[in-house]
Amino acid sequence: MTELMTQNSALPVWQSQDHQDDPVIAELRNHFGPDAFSVQPTRTGIPVVWVKREQILKVLTFLKKLPKPYVMLYDLHGVDERLRTHRQGLPAADFTVFYHLISIDRNRDIMLKVALSENDLHLPTCTRIFPNANWYERETWEMFGMTFDGHTHLTRIMMPKSWEGHPLRKDYPARATEFDPFVLTKQKEDLEMEGLTFKPEEWGMKRGKDNEDFMFLNLGPNHPSAHGAFRIILQLDGEEIVDCVPDIGYHHRGAEKMGERQSWHSYIPYTDRVEYLGGCVNEMPYVLAVEKLAGIVVPDRVNVIRVMLSELFRINSHLLYISTYIQDVGGMTPVFLAFTDRQKIYDVVEAITGFRMHPAWFRIGGVAHDLPRGWEGLLREFLDWLPKRLDSYVKVALRNSVLRARAEGVAAYGAKEALDWGVTGAALRATGIDFDVRKWRPYSGYENFNFEVPVGDGVSDCYSRVMLKVEEMRQSLRILEQCLNNMPAGPFKADHPLTTPPPKERTLQHIETLITHFLQVSWGPVMPANESFQMIEATKGINSYYLTSDGSTMSYRTRIRTPSFPHLQQIPSVIRGSLVSDLIVYLGSIDFVMSDVDR
């Protein structure tokens, strides 16, 4: 088990910091020299270092080999800098590629940035250092046009092969009305269908061996065990999986592009739909990141309300996960039982927020309104109901000998492989790594709650992953019990000029507040020019928002890092040599939805 150090800072999280005192800055200076890079002050809460393109692979390798290494490539993506006006003190750049690394031993992050000119968008691939960079580099090339030299398959990943242009560039249209009317001719249809034809040679696969042909089988994109619009092309030798290629993007909606056209306030409903089972959990990292930009400190009551709603949705998501997992293995009854339990959660959520799946209820600086009368009774009823139901799921289904035979030891991997592929959440903790953001990087007051983090015994397989989720639900019940018994008094919104919308009561008395209310609701609040970042422990792993403000009513760049994206990229490395039936159990054990993958 890895010991972690909780991050500490004497400065408020919204103040710009360059983190010059972070030990990694001194280590980089000692190794590469003081002039090898520059440090950017931000409100991200982590060191942000600009590195020369020629040095990026050396720096990445150095960080991964430190005594307390930065072992995980958490994120990699790009920014179109051409229209950004507030760039004082930053290296000249038309485009930027950033690398976000995590050190588990240090419980610290670092972000590396590489400046690129529009005339030369080449930089070397880092897939030999971090294998999970594969998909991130493909998406960055697709969305911005940066070419990662040495990448073995730099092709489109979210968009159809026939798509033209790079959608996240600033000169690319953001609305359908800015395009010509779409007409699907027979010729275009044939072209699209041809683009979906799998050609093994493009992926370095052989069509056969020893005078025998392999079978190539499409699992999905419309298969019940694919859990959404998701295709996996299987290379089969009988029932054995020789290799496979996950094919994603069918659910891509351009969530990050939408963030550039919505105000800071009006983007909140879009966050619910990134991982559509998570509800308020999705809103948490976004509003916290915006509040860092604004310098808002919310009241204690807001923190506890947000935690309460997040844990309700965590249980709701986990219930659907374990019931559909059991269904994938062959047990039907738990699905119907779980929907009864989830209905009780929705009763509580609807009474509090007015909505069920997608509340869009968190606000910049607070929540939409205060808790209603009688919420305590609804929550009390649910807390009394669920523990016995969890016991029955474990006793009747999860300890079933058939299920255990199908799941134990299947699709198993250890801590090193999990970190190499960017795995987070219960799948990572099943390998024995005790890393839960709620504990080690507390947000929204989680440090004030008493709960345990379930951790596995060193191997993450199809059985340990689901059993950890059951224990996580029990811990969420503990947190909810504390919310019920210790709900603070006080306002449900912060008293801050950028709280959106401002407290309604004052608009009836002060003309300045009325004007502010009108402007913030119609145009949106103006956030200070800066960058902020917030990660949380979401239902399926670590989710985060990396926001860039250019001093406007809208985000200049909204980067959404979701846990399901790297989890699906890992599939081939885990399932090679297994049977097709094992793949079905493995897919059920991952816990993903395609909106979380494709955004």
Swiss-Prot record:
The main location is: membrane
Keyword entries, A-Z: Cell inner membrane, Cell membrane, Membrane, Multifunctional enzyme, NAD, Quinone, Translocase, Transport, Ubiquinone
A single Gene Ontology CC term: plasma membrane
- Matching SUPFAM superfamilies: HydB/Nqo4-like, Nqo5-like
Q: What is its EC number?
A: 7.1.1.-
Query: What molecular function does GO assign, one term?
Result: NAD binding
Reaction(s) catalysed by this chain's protein:
a quinone + NADH + 5 H(+)(in) = a quinol + NAD(+) + 4 H(+)(out)
Q: How does it sit in the membrane?
A: Peripheral membrane protein
Localization in the cell: Cell inner membrane
Region described as NADH dehydrogenase I subunit D: 213-599
Region NADH dehydrogenase I subunit C, annotated ranges: 1-189
Looking up InterPro entries in the UniProt record yields: NADH_DH_suC, NADH_DH_suCD, NADH_Q_OxRdtase_suD, NADH_quin_OxRdtase_su_C/D-like, NADH_UbQ_OxRdtase_30kDa_su, NADH_UbQ_OxRdtase_49kDa_CS, NDH1_su_D/H, NiFe-Hase_large
Family, similarity comment: In the N-terminal section; belongs to the complex I 30 kDa subunit family. In the C-terminal section; belongs to the complex I 49 kDa subunit family.
Q: How does it assemble?
A: NDH-1 is composed of 13 different subunits. Subunits NuoB, CD, E, F, and G constitute the peripheral sector of the complex.
Q: What does this protein do?
A: NDH-1 shuttles electrons from NADH, via FMN and iron-sulfur (Fe-S) centers, to quinones in the respiratory chain. The immediate electron acceptor for the enzyme in this species is believed to be ubiquinone. Couples the redox reaction to proton translocation (for every two electrons transferred, four hydrogen ions are translocated across the cytoplasmic membrane), and thus conserves the redox energy in a proton gradient.
**Know the name of this protein?**
NADH-quinone oxidoreductase subunit C/D
Q: Which organism is it from?
A: Sodalis glossinidius (strain morsitans)
